[in-house]
């Protein structure tokens, strides 16, 4: 469905929810407002879709996890620790020749953190993809009784869809 409509998926996460019969899929993608509306309408028609809705980026919480392994030695270890401290990243592994950082934050924070490593040798990196919830109480779409909806949940947040 996404490929046929020409959408480029930036991020896709799937997770369990407090309801064991429901999985939550969060898709981050770019497209025109018209194309996003069309995608929402078509996804609603899928048999497995319980709900689909757009989260306003200004009214939602978005987070992503980055694991980053960087080559290091005695000469650059202090500088790498300083970058880690500025971004509040955790050093979760340290060896004589590498450091592994863990950073949780908004995608733009992750991007900015990664830009700080352009002069260092990145050995490995892995990003989880964005997951999101609406701020405050229960999202208005989540208040529908289960019998009024079908069988799975596909939240599709904002134009940046996180």
Outline where the language-model segments fall.
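Long, contiguous binding/interaction regions
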Residues: 1-23, 28-162
């Amino acid at each position: 469905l996404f490929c046929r409509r020409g959408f480029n998926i930036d991020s896709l996460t799937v997770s369990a929810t407090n309801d064991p019969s429901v999985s939550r899929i969060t898709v981050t993608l770019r497209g025109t407002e018209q194309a996003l509306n069309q995608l929402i309408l078509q996804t609603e028609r899928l048999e497995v879709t319980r709900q689909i809705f757009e989260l306003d980026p200004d009214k939602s919480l978005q987070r992503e996890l980055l694991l980053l392994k960087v080559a290091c030695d005695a000469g650059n270890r202090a500088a790498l620790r300083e970058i880690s401290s500025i971004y509040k990243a955790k050093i979760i592994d340290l060896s004589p020749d590498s450091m592994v950082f863990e950073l949780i934050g908004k995608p733009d924070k992750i991007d900015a953190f990664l830009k700080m490593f352009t002069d260092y040798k990145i050995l490995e990196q892995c990003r989880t993809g964005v997951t999101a919830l609406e701020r405050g109480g229960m999202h208005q779409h989540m208040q529908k009784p289960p019998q009024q909806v079908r069988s799975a949940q596909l939240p599709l947040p904002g134009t940046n869809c996180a």
